[in-house]
């Protein structure tokens, strides 16, 4: 019992001690608040008296006492214990504060000690303080307060005024060392290192500035000497426009670039037999065994190499007609003057420095002066078209990689670009099997693409704009570069007229699919093939089709059992809109899966449509097909649907396109290569003669024969009789007449559709009734 009382007593004593500490903390906070500036807010005696008390001891530094009391009070409230006032950092604070107070007092009383006979520092400080309290003096006269006065008195007696200043310096240094725990040597070394680093940077910048200045002077001197020589060399490459009193723009005809190597290419293409023999030997060198040495159980969706197969030669294509735009050059001078006059009349300071004459359009490079907004030139679109009397112009602002704005004006006549002249530029490149030719850009350079790098392509444009010719050019380019065992194709043509010419070529996996319902099943089979290929990659530890084929090649070298390589698969859909109308969900799901995952499996999509609306080219399809080609469309909305930007509505048609491959920020204007139907037939006939088509059974979309089951509903016969009499079919009518629910009525309508009694669902239109209305005799007998 006594122990319990002692324990309770100790506990109470600890509680009382904590309460005392908290009360002391609150008291210190009270003194800090009312001792520093509270007199300005309150007219009471205590705030003013406390403030004067702090000023008496600390002078102009009286707020330090308030801060010290405030921090100490909060410390007591939070920690509930007394702080260590003799800590090393606290000692440093005391020494530093003493030095500051003494220094302030020296500055105040130094002049008075020299001019007056009274040398009592404490007496003078007392007098100055009460002068401030009575209103005849200022707070600055109090200096460091009575603490500063006492310290200065002792120091002045020991060391005089000069010695006191030295004491102050040492007090500040010693206090800083105690407070920061940094030695003077460390501070000096760090300061020296920082000054040295800054000086080195300054010296380096100055040296670099001097070097650049000398280089600029030297370059300016060289430019002055070589400008004449450069102008002479450029005059040999371009045609000059003789316009007086202004700078002459350079004119670059696309024929200068397109046809500069015609003689060399013609010589190389005169001996197709030799090229075919070399190609054949190269292909034979890559394979060690023929098809007879293969395993009995061949892997599905693989093809054995036919060593007798010869690729089509460029001679099967029509010879290019080297057209030029010489008739356009006589009008360029007048066009340049009209453009500059238009700019001047609207207050736009700009110069035309270069002119590129392309197959279909002429591009004028306009260099605006500093301070001219690009939008000001773009807003002159209609005025420029009016001044040039052009049916439409296109403004490219700015030209990528140049500080210029491009104005594209249609030519009076379009120079035809043939597929052969574009393929001649790339015929030496045999490694890429999926390289295809598109046409020529404004500068005359051949524009080609590699489908395996895109990896999918979306082609859209209005009817008659050149979309089908572009698709035929892509297919022909692949047929002329790849053998059937290297590239396979799946063609879907709901229009039944565009791709049927390719039926029978050995590259096809299945006959050209023309039924939209079969097309959705064909796409599902391609998805299944993609998944099967990924299973093969997983089993062999490879990541893509190139790695898998390399793995098979190494296995074939080490083993007698020869395994075939996986071919690339190109899926062509000529009209996506028809497929989306019949089976939009299945088609979109299959295309989305292929676009997301099929690249590594060697499966690539080429999707063409003549209706570029958002319900056909959905956001999901666009997001997964980054490479796009836009032909002429009717509105800027359709252009934005294809390219995410305008411009396609200003194209001229007849193969004029905007090509935006993956990774490109802006589309490139290209004049598409023309390919006639006769040329396509010659290429197809050559491929069929070399090897007959062997379709893959597992890739042919099968027919679905749905067995119509009997309807287990007593109202079916009555519903059929009602619909035949009314010659109108709807779910709501059956609900009202027979007083049944929606589900049962909809099931009856579906059963009638399966049996050919009513037509299919046509949106807001009523279903058509396919059975005739019964006669009065039939109604009476029933």
UniProtKB/Swiss-Prot annotation:
Cytoplasmic side: 187-782
Residues annotated as domain FtsK: 444-640
Record's bilayer topology term: Multi-pass membrane protein
Molecular function via GO: ATP binding; ATP hydrolysis activity; DNA binding
Annotated spans, Disordered: 264-300, 760-782
Disulfide bonds: none
SMART domains reported for this sequence: AAA, Ftsk_gamma
Ranges that cross the membrane: 21-41, 56-76, 90-110, 143-163, 166-186
Record note on quaternary structure: Homohexamer. Forms a ring that surrounds DNA.
Function: Essential cell division protein that coordinates cell division and chromosome segregation. The N-terminus is involved in assembly of the cell-division machinery. The C-terminus functions as a DNA motor that moves dsDNA in an ATP-dependent manner towards the dif recombination site, which is located within the replication terminus region. Required for activation of the Xer recombinase, allowing activation of chromosome unlinking by recombination.
Name used for this protein in its record: DNA translocase FtsK
Lineage: Bacteria, Bacillati, Bacillota, Bacilli, Bacillales
